[in-house]
């Protein structure tokens, strides 16, 4: 599809599951929030390449609508905050999502999709404010950072240490 000019830019069928701009609801208990279009690197296998170039404001201004949608759908028990890479957002945006979603009783699990532990681990271990946010909100809901290491050498000692320190 990628090299065929007639191929689909939406190879995973995301358009049919999009309920709001930046929110996909394919499976009843789960929503995917596309919180940013930024990444620390662009992966060869990425299926969201078509999103590169959208303004950050355009994606981030939808957070309140997304939180309202989740609040109105009690079947949703877990939220995957991704993008792009969710941890490329400023801490204020991350806190906006955490505060809004942690206030919803029927949410049990919040996941952040991020290759930051691989591509920019300093974003975690160099930012005490981010670590404090995770520590504070992990007391209210279960938090995970869902990441992907493509090769064992990508899993550095620093990455292992900081993932544990992040309380997620």
Show where each model-derived region lies.
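Conserved AdoMet/S-adenosylmethionine-binding subsite of the radical SAM
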Residues: 64-78, 87-166
């Amino acid at each position: 599809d990628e090299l065929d000019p007639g191929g689909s830019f939406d190879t995973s069928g995301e358009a049919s599951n999009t309920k709001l701009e930046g929110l996909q609801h394919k499976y009843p208990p789960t929503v995917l929030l596309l919180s940013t279009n930024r990444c620390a690197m662009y992966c060869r296998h990425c299926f969201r390449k078509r999103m590169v170039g959208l303004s950050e404001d355009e994606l981030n201004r939808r957070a309140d609508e997304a939180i309202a949608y989740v609040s109105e759908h009690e079947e949703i028990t877990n939220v995957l905050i991704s993008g792009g890479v969710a941890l490329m957002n400023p801490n204020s945006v991350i806190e906006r999502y955490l505060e809004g979603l942690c206030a919803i009783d029927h949410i049990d699990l919040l996941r952040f999709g991020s290759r930051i532990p691989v591509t920019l681990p300093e974003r975690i271990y160099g930012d005490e404010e981010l670590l404090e946010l995770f520590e504070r909100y992990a007391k209210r809901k279960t938090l995970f950072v869902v990441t992907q290491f493509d090769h064992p050498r990508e899993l550095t000692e620093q990455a292992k240490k900081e993932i544990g320190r992040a309380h997620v």
